[in-house]
Amino acid sequence: MRHRVLIADPLEETGTALLREVAEVTVRPKLSEEELAQLIGDYDALIVRSGTKVTRRVIERAARLKVIGRAGIGVDNIDVDAATERGIFVVNAPSAVTTATAEHTFALLLALLRKIPQAWQSVREGKWERTKFVGNQLQGKTIGIIGLGRIGTQVARYAKAFGLRVLACDPFITEERARQLGIELRELDDLLRDADIVTVHVPLTKETRHLLDARALSLMKPTAVLVNTARGGVVDEEALYEALVQGRLAGAALDVLEHEPPKEGTASARLTQLPNVIVTPHLGASAKEAQEEAAMEVAKQVLAVLRGDFPTTAVNLPAIPADVLHALRPFMHLAERMGRFLSQFCQGRVGEVRLNYAGQIAEMEAEPLTRAFLKGLMEMRLPETVNFVNAPALARARGIRVVEERHLQPTDYASLIVATVRTHLEERSVAGAVFQGVGPRLVQIDGYRVDVAPEGHAILVEQIDRPGIIGRVGTLLGQNNINIAFMQVGRKEVGGKAVMVIMVDTPAPPELLAQLRTAHDAILDVRQVDFGPPLPLSGGMP
């Protein structure tokens, strides 16, 4: 059955056409919350821009929804927490609008400093007032950038080209990265005091709402100007209005407001009437090239999720560059199968998960691997949908302690993942590695060396290493028409405990497992595991 995609805001035809190649696409712009809530239950994917609000109420009605795509950067119109709780990917198109928004930032800044809108209006009125509109140049000024994401970084590059001294405030940027960009990192208060121009490039969150309030604005020079092409709520507009009216700030250029369009009586509306303020109607991403790129980018991300692949721009997952994802993908498959194995091999309530990443894999991003393991561990035990998005939250909600460890020193393998699960009854472990040209393999079960492809059905026999067990087990399986594809025994010493792994073409029924447990007095226990279908040779999300 073809996937169904609902597009609830205008989207460039390039993106729509790409979606139509593999999915049934419905375009319904300007839906109310009630209308969207009524429709959403029939769709696998939803694509919006900034106009449509995807609320918790809508998401709770989305029985089939796998992904919400935002054709742009900001996702404050989407209840990301609600989507995450239900295991719905939220993806955006961050790279598509970077250039357009950064360019618009400088368009506003230059227009503000050179008083271009006011001069143009004067000319339209038949005047030619050269001396009235003397402005300021950029070169030699200091610009303070709040937020060094994609757009903030691009603004920094443009600022350097204009001959500006660049300050920046971002808690996630290292000093080394700042030096590479040729900028100076500052705390917010210091940046506000020193900058001639302050420009905002952070998302609107609980932490950033009214980040620039009355206190923060009071730190700025009276000759300074403010530019905001991010989100209106980041700036306290009442405080901004007062600062501008009282001459404590020279001017502001705004592409975003708290109320869009401005509502009468609000600070948003009053700001539009000030002579030292320039306002554009949220045009940062409104370049034809940017819209086409955003449509294509979000369409590709949505299709990646629908075909079971891993999106690279999910906002409710750690961002993973494409090259890193390519390197991690086989280990993600391995981690997911290891979790799936321990979910069935362990008995009792899971209390703790310990993941040890050793060798080369220890130098890479671990969170996607941990998410993959938790997905495999919980998806067969829980009634709700478990995926990469909600697996950590589901583990936390159940009080499962997750511990990650890294060991960079070499092991017997280039990279090794060791997973240990502790329940209220027992502790079990499994280790896995990825081999070039072969793929993922389990290499240890409870410390016993094995070499098992984590695919299909497996019967695990815990035993004392004695003669005759393989024959008894093989005979019983044959008598019950269970074909053995592969068999291996892992042991530490002759005559000691051992584990036998038997890969079978079809699962054994419960009554046969019971017979196997009593087939020999040296058999300690018998358990069965469904690893899942064969792994793809490349690509695809576990």
Give the label of every model feature segment.
Residues 1-91, 213:
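An N-terminal-biased, well-structured beta-alpha scaffold segment characteristic
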Residues 11, 172, 490:
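Residues in the short beta-alpha loop(s) of Rossmann-like NAD(P)-binding domains
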Residues 52-59, 171-268:
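Rossmann-like adenosine-cofactor binding region
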Residues 86, 94-142, 150, 154-161, ...:
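Phosphate-binding beta-alpha-beta segment of Rossmann-like dinucleotide-binding domains, i.e.
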Residues 86, 90-91, 214, 223-345, ...:
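Rossmann-like dinucleotide-binding domain for NAD(H)/NADP(H)
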Residues 102-121, 141, 157-164, 243, ...:
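Oxidoreductase and adenylate-handling cofactor-binding alpha/beta cores
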Residues 319-542:
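A conserved regulatory-domain signal marking ACT and ACT-like small-molecule sensing domains
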